[in-house]
Amino acid sequence: GGQYIFITNNSSKSVNDYVEKVTKMGIRAGYENFYTSSQATAMYINENYPDQVVYCMGTRSLVNELREAGISVVTEVDDRASVVLIGFDTENTSEKIRNTCIMLGRNVVYLATNPDFVCPVSFGYIPDCGSMSIMLKNATGKEPFFIGKPEPIMVNCVLKKLGMKAEDAVIIGDRLYTDIKTGVKAGVDTICVLSGEATTQDIEEGDVKPTYVFDSVKEIYEGLTEA
């Protein structure tokens, strides 16, 4: 059988949170089956800005993930911080936003975990990290460098982790501007499922084209079992 990893841009939760979530859904998965934008961000900071203090506007899970990776993290205005990082912060407050604007007024590196505009919830959608970055741009004029999808960083890390070549992998997702685009950038075949955000019209009219299109993950499974 093949290998699989869930790649998520959601930096608001820990890997353990995701393992628990999919287990409740009846899906067998362990820690090794997930790779998050939080993990990718920690790796990116350690490789590009080692030993620097990072100001983070994010959830406690994101802050803990960074600290566990050996990164010095502050969550208040701090003169030592040379890197500002924002994530999908479901614990956000007006004070956090104010502090982030203060920090962005300084000569700092500005990073963000992911460019997603919205996150699906039970009643519809809520603003994700991409929307928060637009809000901060309107206030400060600053734009971040995004770590997660559609940048190929996460995919390249996963391929290396699995010891797999790009031509032997496929990315499945429902968002053209993150899931599918990251596959295109990483040189990996893609499958767009129409059970989420993307529609047939989006694919026809958009610049990002998936390799394959299926109505749902179930249809992919049925196709594989029949093969």
Language model features with spans:
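Conserved phosphoryl-transfer catalytic core
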Residues: G2
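Asp-based, Mg2+/Mn2+-dependent phosphohydrolase catalytic module
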Residues: S11-Y35, A42-A227
